[in-house]
Swiss-Prot record:
The chain crosses the membrane at residues 31-51, 186-206, 238-258, 268-288, 303-323, 355-375. Signal peptide: none annotated. PANTHER family: MEMBRANE COMPONENT OF ABC TRANSPORTER YHHJ-RELATED, MULTIDRUG ABC TRANSPORTER PERMEASE YBHS-RELATED. It is found in: Cell membrane. Keywords: Cell membrane, Membrane, Transmembrane, Transmembrane helix. To B.subtilis YhaP. InterPro entries: ABC-2_transporter_component, ABC2_TM. GO terms for molecular function: ABC-type transporter activity. Its main location: membrane. It is a multi-pass membrane protein. It comes from Methanocaldococcus jannaschii (strain ATCC 43067 / DSM 2661 / JAL-1 / JCM 10045 / NBRC 100440) (Methanococcus jannaschii). It comes from the Archaea. This is Uncharacterized protein MJ1024.
Length: 403
């Protein structure tokens, strides 16, 4: 962007275009579905699934005890606050037990072989590939109790069942901070939130720009303002829509954070906010420029989809990054603008990053955003009035380097 381009920027017009973009996009059905209805459906399905999983009043389990453990007639298990009764039905014949599993007379059949003590082998027959965990957990506890009976006291038995109550503390120059399971999930949540936000952003940008090109609204807007003002206004408006969408998603998650008193590190929160904004600006400017070249969503998806797919790379290496934040792959991803917003936040969630790495990564992101804006303005000025069919990557590259 040269000084001439900067002089063409009109804040009032940018804000007017941005406002129009916000109002037109929040009225779209896609926005309502993706922002409110989608999360509500996911939450509803999760609640229904949990209710169905944990609201099991009784389970019938057949067994053939060749070893002679002496299995009780029934066991009552506390299943997330609700009691589930497991009835054990003795079988003398394995084939009869299998038959009853098939006709759903019993939920599962357990066979304890004669050589159980030597092999530790237990055979379970079920109509499902993944048997109910209540059955396997109950059986595991029962076997431990039988094997340890008369050999250890109750205190030792309870410790064998639950060998440790692990507390994790992160160590830094500021001192010690206790970590919880949910606080460890927050950076993972951030990664998926950013991925969803940028994926949603691409859909909003593509549909908005292409729709305006098809309806020739873009030409009317260019009569009102320059291409630079129009692009900045669109980025501002679409970014505002995206942030509104994220704000609504965060509101859905807020009850969980408050209920479980999840501690959010200020250090991590600042990192997440900075890199979220940097990532959002980088992708929004790039997508805006590229989308303007196309007249049909199908054509646009061929070029834009690979850019969105690149984001999956840090998700693929998420475990490596969090287990070993100083791994060379984690560092490389921290310096690539497409992946840095993900990699840096994941690394910062498990370790204190050196200042030089933070400065270098942030500088690369800022420079990349500036380059992205310069490139996108060039594409936008040409693309908004371009109505070519089946635009190829080769043609796009020619447009980029055309003087």
């Amino acid at each position: 962007m040269n000084s001439g381009d900067i002089m063409k920027l009109n804040i009032k017009k940018i804000l007017t275009i941005g406002k129009r973009e916000v109002l037109s996009n929040i009225k779209r059905k896609q926005f309502l579905i993706a922002t409110i209805i989608g999360p509500l459906i996911i939450i509803a399905l999760a609640i229904i699934g949990s209710f169905m999983m944990f609201d099991i009043k009784e389970i019938k389990v057949g067994y053939v005890d060749e070893f002679g453990l002496g299995i009780p007639n029934k066991v009552v298990e506390n299943n997330f606050g609700k009691n589930t009764t497991i009835y054990f039905i003795k079988y003398e014949n394995i084939e009869k037990g299998k038959e009853d599993v098939l006709n759903k007379s019993i939920d599962a059949l357990i066979v304890i072989p004669k050589d159980y003590l030597d092999s530790g082998k237990i055979i379970l027959y079920s109509t499902t590939k993944s048997p109910n965990p209540i059955i396997t957990d109950t059986l595991n506890k029962f076997l431990l109790k039988k094997l340890l009976k008369g050999k250890v006291d109750n205190k030792t038995y309870n410790r064998v069942i639950n060998p440790m109550n692990l507390e994790i503390y992160s160590v830094s120059k500021k001192g010690f901070e206790k970590e919880t399971f949910l606080s460890q999930l927050l950076p993972i949540g951030f990664v998926f939130l950013l991925y969803m936000a940028i994926s949603s952003l691409s859909g909003i940008i593509v549909s908005s720009i292409i729709e305006e090109k098809q309806n020739r609204i873009m030409e009317l807007l260019l009569c009102y303002s320059s291409a630079e003002n129009l692009m900045f206004g669109k980025i501002l408006g679409i970014s505002a829509v995206g942030l509104l969408q994220i704000g609504i998603w965060v509101l859905f998650a807020l009850p969980i954070i408050i209920t479980y008193a999840v501690k959010v590190s200020l250090y991590l929160a600042i990192f997440a906010l900075i890199y979220f904004v940097l990532g959002y600006l980088f992708y929004s400017s790039l997508l805006c420029g590229l989308s303007s070249l196309f007249s049909h969503p199908k054509d646009a998806s061929q070029l834009i989809s690979p850019i969105i797919i690149i984001q999956i790379i840090p998700i693929m290496f998420m475990n490596t990054i969090m287990v070993n934040p100083n791994h060379y792959m984690a560092k490389i991803l921290s310096y690539v603008p497409f992946t840095a917003p993900y990699a840096v936040v994941l690394r910062a969630s498990v370790t204190q990053l050196p200042l030089i790495e933070i400065v270098l990564s942030t500088a690369i992101m800022i420079v990349s955003i500036v380059i992205s804006f310069i490139l996108s303005i060039k594409l936008f000025k040409i693309g908004v009035l371009l109505y070519e069919e089946n635009l190829t990557l080769k043609r796009v590259i020619k447009i980029i380097f055309k003087k």
